[in-house]
Amino acid sequence: MSESETINVNGPSQDFSYSDSPFCMEASFSSSDLLQSETKNVKRGNESTHTFSEDIYSTEGSLLGDINLGNYPESEQNQPANTRLSSLRQFEPICKFHWIEAFNDEMTVEDLRGAFSYSEKPELPSQVYNDAADGSEKPDPFKEESSVESSISENKDELVPAPVRKSPRSLCLNYYRGEAQPLTEAPFVRSAVVDVGLNISQPQSFLDKENVCKNGDNSSDRENCFEQLDLRAIYKAEEPEVSSKEVQNSGEISELSVSHQEEVTEDGVDSLAITSPWSPAGIFKGSGPQDNSLRPDREVSCEGLEPLEEDMALNEALQKLKQTNKKQELQIQDLHGKNLNLENRVQELQTKVTKQHVLVDIINKLKVNIEELINDKYNVILEKNDINKKLQDLQEASAHTKKHLQESKKDKESLQLQVKKIKVHYVRLQERYIAEIQQKNRSASQCLEIEKTLSKKDEELQRLQRHKGELEKATSSALDLLKREKEIREQEFLSFQEEFQRREKESLKERRKLKSRVEKLVAQVKSLLFTCESERAQTMALQRQVEELKLENLELRQLAAKREAQACTPSFEITQSKEQLEEAVEPDITQETKGTHCNLFLNRSSCKENLELQPLKKTSPLASGIHSLLALRIGLLTCQDLATPDAELCQESKKANDIMLQRLKDCQLKKKDLDKELLKHKNRIATLKELIASEKALQAHTIEITDFDADEVKSARDAPVLLAVKLDKYHSLNEELDVLITKLGGLLESKEDHYSRLIEENDKYRRHVGSLINKVTSYEEIIKCADQRLEISHSQIAHLEERNRHLEDLIRMPREKAKRPRPRLDNHPKSLTLISHLEGHHKECSISL
């Protein structure tokens, strides 16, 4: 399929689903999934489309005349699921006419106004536009084009020429033959299917426009189109079966035609039963004579075979039609673009016109405003003249009034002088009267004030006496409390000093003990190091002894060889003795190397062996060294026993620290109690200060009082002196209390510092004890290493003793063999394997002899 053929195969329209022919059904099955969704949306569309299709059907019935377009109820029965589809099938014959005109290359685009100038319903074009707009609402890739067309048709009342659709002639042929040919038989059939897809992809609005445009054709033209359709259906009978191979093999063409004739004769009845409104049989479904006239033509078309040149010509015609359709589509697109440009220009012109109208309105308004302003100007000028006249009149009146005012001023001044004189006399009389009244009031008020002050002084004296007694009691109680607290604090301080001295003595004792223990441990470590060095010297001496024993063994071997040569012993006894000596020497050498390079951590099985071999060690010359090592071991154990009191001392120090912390907590609680008492004393001192301030205020008030008697003045003078003496006493007491409070605060701070120092010293002692414990643990590890070395040395000594015994036995072997052929060596379990081996070898030798 070429690119030009696939341009419009994007959104299948509903036009293809209207036909019921077999070929159309097969072509529709390939895109059934897409069509189902679209048909559902169509079912949910407006119900107005059904009424619109019925109106168009009525107009079509009036236009077509005598031609029977098919039975509407029957088409409704074929597709009851979709009412809109059944209603739109009434226009299928008109679509057939358009297809026939497309094959004849008679494509014409007519204006709806000219086509329906004689129609009975003038509202049909607007209905067509509405139907096109409804079709544009469906999900279609050509939605934008349909919307543009609808807008152009509404603005300009004209229709854009739509491309004339072609119907593949294979549809008609498939209907007559009653079978669907495969799409892969010939390339022409593929092109026909592509045409069907192109027709499907067109929007429904184009179909409606073409239907409306072609409604005005004459019935004679339609009859000619039907005849041409029948002829082309006859020609098309052989086109789906012709391929590139069949063109070369002409013999196969006749066979294919004969087979098709048989299929037509067999299935003709079924194909006639399945009629669609899009097929020619559907067009003539209602009339019987037309069907009868078609059947002989069909038989003639099946019998005769047309040449291939006509097929080629038809293909060329179809290609030309496709090209013309493409050109028309391009022209339509250009027209769409031009229409859009024109619409934009019209909108611009409309905006310009509206702007001009607005400007004209503004100019008219300005003219009216200018006229109003001119009228206002003339009115203002007239008003100004009137105002000038009124001003002149007012000036004249003001001159007359000024004269009258000057005269009245003179009269007023004379009257004012008289009034002033009268006022002066009245003021003097009033002042005399006020002075007399004030003197009377002063004398009365002074008497009342003197009485009030005397009563107040008596009350204040009584109140001061009460406060004096309360202050004396409070001061005495505060002094007693402070003395008691001072004694308690001194006792606590002495107890703390005693405890501190005791702790210092204990710490000194602990230090001395620890120093002595450390010195003892150092001496023990030195002794252990000395013992280790002595053990090393002993191991060196043992190695020397081993070397000497090796030399002795070599000498013994040489002596044994000489004796064997002299005694002429058999060869197998000599070989046995050599093998025994070699096997005895090799494990001794390996044990020596392992003993010298062994680690410090060994199993304790060697210790058990040492305990079993103690009676043997007494006989050896190294027994004295072993006894000394055991004594060192006992000393180390005693050191470990002495290390246990250190842990007890640590526990005692922890307990003492806990006791100190508890005492510190008690001291803090006591400190809080003292702070509360100090707050109470401060509150009392504040009350005393308030009383003193009130007394000072009374003194100031007494100084202001005047006009007293001599006795009252003396008592008033003596009262502040007495109060001052009392206040001095109170001040002295307060100062003493402040001094005591500061001393107590200093003592508390010093004790807190002392406690913090004690805590720091305790921390230092703990750290020192921890370091000592670490040292003790390190010494214990050193002792363990020394013990392990001792065990290693014991094991080495045991191995050396066993080796010496084994060597002695080996030396005795040749002497005993001469006396006893089978010696028993119960004391050496390792040599049993050698004896069994020697006995077996001896038996073999005896058998061979």
From Swiss-Prot:
- Ranges of Polar residues compositional bias? 245-259
Query: Which residue intervals make up region (Disordered)?
Result: 125-160, 241-268
Segments of skewed composition (Basic and acidic residues)? 135-146
User: Which segments does the entry list as coiled coil?
Assistant: 309-568
**In which tissues or organs does this protein occur?**
Expressed in spermatids and spermatozoa. Localized to the acrosomal matrix and acrosomal granule. Predominantly expressed during postmeiotic stages of spermatogenesis.
Q: Which InterPro entries match?
A: CAGE1_homolog, CAGE1_N
> What is the protein name for this chain?
Cancer-associated gene 1 protein homolog
Print the organism lineage: Eukaryota, Metazoa, Chordata, Craniata, Vertebrata
What gene is this protein translated from?
A: Cage1
